[in-house]
Amino acid sequence: MAFSSNVHANETCKTLLATGNPEYPPYLWRDPEDENRLIGANAEWMQLLSKEIGIPIDIKYIGPWGRVQEEAKLGRVDLLAGAFFTQPRLEYMDYFYPAFRETRTVIWTRSNFTLPYKKWSDLVGKQGVTVINNSFGEEFDRYAKESLKISMVPSLEQALKMLSLSRADYLIYEEDPGLAYVAKMNISGLKTVAPPITNENLYLTLSHKSACNTPEMRGRIAKAVYKLDKQNVMSKLITANIQLWRKQQSK
């Protein structure tokens, strides 16, 4: 049986199609020289994974993050190169452990705006903004839904503009991607406030409906993820890709 499932996996899995959040430097963003391609630290990590499992991984731009998740649900993409853990996502994707990166989600506000923030409840009564379909961990997502006033917008650029034009009191977003976009848009007068909203793990996921989702393939990917984690490659990739993103934006 093991042999026949291997043959089946090899027949249906000549390549794997991967995608992710395209507004996510230094992790992922669209290649300025080929807008159908995603580049960044996660994309480079996926190429190392590809070598380990012996199957080419094609990292394509599919659309914004909301659409990406829909495509994963339908099995039109195989892998997501970076997703937070949420219960609803378990219904359509398998997660691989360990996580390949821990990220910090922070509160952004204007430098001249006083936001006395030490805990989540300090945000009650203030107008927040974030990007549609973003999750910041189950606990915060639930709290935000029940207690906070947060507008959802399609892109991080729009959210940062709203914040700098005082149409929102605060923005919730991850620190590294936020810093990358602030640099790109040349916005000044914004700051982050401590403590972080959450420290969240980024995982590799495989769609349940992917033709490549076989026990043999899951085992192969799981082994490779474990090996790459032990080699601690991600920190080096992030440093290099922050530099690459800045260089591209200043052209």
What do these predicted regions represent?
Residues 10-84, 91:
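Extracytoplasmic small-molecule ligand-binding "clamshell" domains
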Residues 51, 61, 66-78, 95, ...:
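Short helices/loops that flank or line small-molecule/ion binding pockets
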Residues 22, 102-106, 183-222, 244-250:
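Periplasmic-binding protein-like
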Residues 66, 83-91, 169-199:
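A ligand-binding cleft/hinge motif common to bilobed small-molecule-binding domains
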Residues 43-52, 113, 134, 206-244:
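Extended ligand-binding regions for polar small-molecule ligands
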Residues 109-127, 215:
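Flexible hinge/capping segments at coil-to-helix
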Residues 15-22, 28, 119-134:
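Short loop->beta-strand "edge-of-pocket" segments that line small-molecule binding or catalytic clefts
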Residues 56, 135-151, 189, 223-251:
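Ligand-binding clefts/hinges and TM-proximal coupling segments of bilobed small-molecule sensing domains
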